């Protein structure tokens, strides 16, 4: 549960939400992306058109159209499709063609397939994932799969990417590579990153702002350095000195 929690995520920053298990971190994500419906409070978002929208009553698929995408703790790729096709599936919400167009393989469908295939190939190239273009997820290193999942979020032209424990299951080397990967995505694609993560090394090394919560309530918010030195956070989350 979340109790009277309020914060702002600024455009272009990497914002980290930390707290013990059960603190309400994933609940916050689920409320923003409309998997959960908040019983009180308001969630506002400055969308892809620069308009402030109220997310509380919005449907899940419309949240994506507004420019918000997310990943989950576990890799959610389609194992029967190669990496390129996994990216193309993620572009589905951007297609103008409908089921009938796809059924008859209309000119619009063909044109969109060319456009989005080029886009996917460009993303894979920009993020140094080209060697895996036609590979299938099964058998690939877990660190690569995490990167592919992040690359896939870019297919819908997001403004905000929400990452739920992106470093979960990664070793130290993979985590370091992922942190650089996240920063590269933020810089090259001009997106805002909002992440929940238990790996404090990753959080403190890449986040511009960190918000610490416990039992659904905000403990403190500030720069990584400020949070590391916060007595409230040390006592509630880090166990004090």
Regions found by a protein language model. Give the residues of each.
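Glycine-rich phosphate-binding loops of nucleotide-dependent enzymes
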Residues: 1-241
């Amino acid at each position: 549960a979340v109790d009277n929690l309020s914060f702002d995520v600024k455009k272009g920053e990497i914002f980290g939400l930390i707290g013990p298990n059960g603190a309400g971190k994933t609940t916050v994500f689920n409320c923003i992306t409309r998997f959960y419906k908040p019983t009180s409070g308001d969630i506002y978002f400055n969308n892809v058109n620069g308009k402030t929208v109220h997310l509380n009553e919005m449907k899940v698929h419309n949240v994506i159209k507004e420019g918000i995408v997310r990943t989950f703790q576990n890799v959610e790729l389609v194992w029967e499709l190669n990496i390129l096709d996994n990216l193309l599936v993620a572009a589905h919400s951007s297609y103008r063609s409908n089921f009938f167009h796809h059924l008859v393989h209309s000119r619009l469908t063909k044109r969109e397939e060319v456009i989005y295939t080029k886009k996917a190939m460009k993303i894979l190239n920009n993020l140094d994932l080209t060697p895996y273009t036609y590979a299938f997820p099964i058998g690939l290193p877990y660190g690569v799969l995490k990167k592919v999942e992040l690359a896939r979020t870019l297919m819908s032209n997001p403004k905000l990417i929400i990452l739920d424990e992106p470093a979960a299951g990664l070793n130290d080397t993979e985590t370091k590579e992922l942190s650089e990967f996240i920063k590269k995505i933020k810089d090259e694609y001009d997106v805002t990153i909002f992440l929940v993560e238990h790996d404090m090394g990753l959080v403190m090394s890449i986040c511009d702002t960190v918000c610490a919560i416990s039992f659904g309530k905000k403990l403190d918010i500030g720069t990584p350095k400020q949070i590391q030195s916060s007595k409230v956070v040390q006592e509630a989350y880090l166990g004090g000195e």
